[in-house]
């Protein structure tokens, strides 16, 4: 009897607990202006996926010098949960070891 009640309680908790289905992808995007591929991590909320997809705003998260495209997922592992809760697409491009990308002295 106790095992059954414990099992039912566990199943109820699983059914009631919120589930987050945001999709985390690591992509290579071709940049014609930089003449190279740029690695990007994209966190897409469930609301922007599937047959009933809706438009969602995007926030670009830029890492600091020495980081990479996966830095923000390491800093904030709950980004998929936030994406689902707020309906936001997070885009995390890899800027390599640069301060900014539009330098006239270094176009690459």
Predicted features along the sequence, with ranges:
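Non-catalytic cap/lid and distal C-terminal segments of serine-dependent acyl enzymes
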Residues: 21-108
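A broad detector of short, well-ordered amphipathic alpha-helices
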Residues: 7-8, 81
């Amino acid at each position: 009897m106790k095992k059954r009640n414990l099992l039912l309680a566990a199943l109820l908790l699983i059914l009631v607990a919120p589930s987050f289905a945001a999709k985390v992808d690591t992509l290579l995007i071709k940049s014609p202006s930089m003449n190279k591929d740029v690695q990007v991590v994209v966190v897409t909320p469930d609301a922007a996926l599937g047959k009933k997809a809706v438009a969602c705003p995007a926030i670009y998260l830029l890492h600091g010098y020495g980081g990479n495209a996966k830095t923000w997922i390491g800093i904030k592992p709950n980004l998929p949960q936030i994406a689902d809760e707020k309906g936001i697409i997070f885009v995390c491009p890899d800027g390599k070891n640069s301060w900014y990308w539009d330098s006239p002295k270094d176009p690459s």
